[in-house]
Amino acid sequence: DVLPMAGEYVAAVLQEGIAKFVEGTQPAGVDTSTVVDTVARISGYKAKAAELLGEPVPPRPPGFCVGCPERPVFSAMKLVEQETGPFHVSADIGCHTFSTLPPFNMGNTVLGYGLGLASSTGVGPNFGNRVVSIMGDGGFWHNGLTTGVANAIFNKDDSVLMIFNNGYTSATGAQHIPSTGTNARLEPTGQDIVSALKGVGVKWIKRVRTYHVSEMRKVLGDAMTTKEGGLKVIIADGECMLAVQRKKKPVDRKAVADGDRVVRSRFGVDEACCTGDHSCVRLSGCPSLTIKSSGDPLKSDPVAHVDEGCVACGLCGENAHAATLCPSFYRADVVQNPTAFDRMVERWRRRYISWLG
């Protein structure tokens, strides 16, 4: 019994398990002291940190990555719930399973990979409104198209299916799937989700960019309230942010090194405008959107703050607009290797600001 039967196999758990295994087996001719000493040293660091902090380090709950394209969809779903009332959400296996945790708490059932729609068909008749099923593009090709969509059409199911089209099986390492566009050998493929849906008889299909929260809110609201029966499918398009960053960062680094103009966007919060009610935090759950002291003795509540991990996905601003929150978010563009025109514009901006006093 060197590893726990339940829980996540994080590095610390694996280190302790390996140390127990090595200690218990004592392989001949192998010095096991290094492994045991390493684990003991790390445990000592943790104990020392807890002592200095005065309290245990707070747990880090699992959640969506910074800039994840799936987070905005659940922000939109929370806004739709305010209009239609609570509805059953049949969750699925994938990154989107994190929606079952705070701050969204959306996902009443999780049956299996690609089985979100199949499970909702069984419970749907027990509710007074339409149920929403969640499915990733990986789950769609794995099981969802046949077990879920085809059977929903066959059984005249009147519900809503949300398909996250992020381009990969992201939760397990961004493996290619039929709709990625290429296979593992980077050979072009001709399969796409819309054609597959139409092929099994789906009539109501909408596509929305995931980061467009207001548009997603409207389309999902229409799907929940339309008098048209049958399965209604919303394809939420947004490439996995980890994949985007893996491609973008090397290109930007090379461009900067070559002396080319590179613009990097960042979002922030105007502390003077922030009201301190933190609705923006509760509506997005972005790890980069946190709080800090206002520094104003007349404003006791902490204000929202965007930290250095921001990838400029724009969700904070989209949520503020869609939910009519305070207008405290702003976007700033950081220009590396600016041109002569950039420098001239910046000089005029500074001069104009000084004139305003």
Question: Residues of each region from the PLM?
Answer:
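Flexible loop/turn segments at secondary-structure boundaries
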Residues: 64, 72-73, 96-100, 139-143, ...
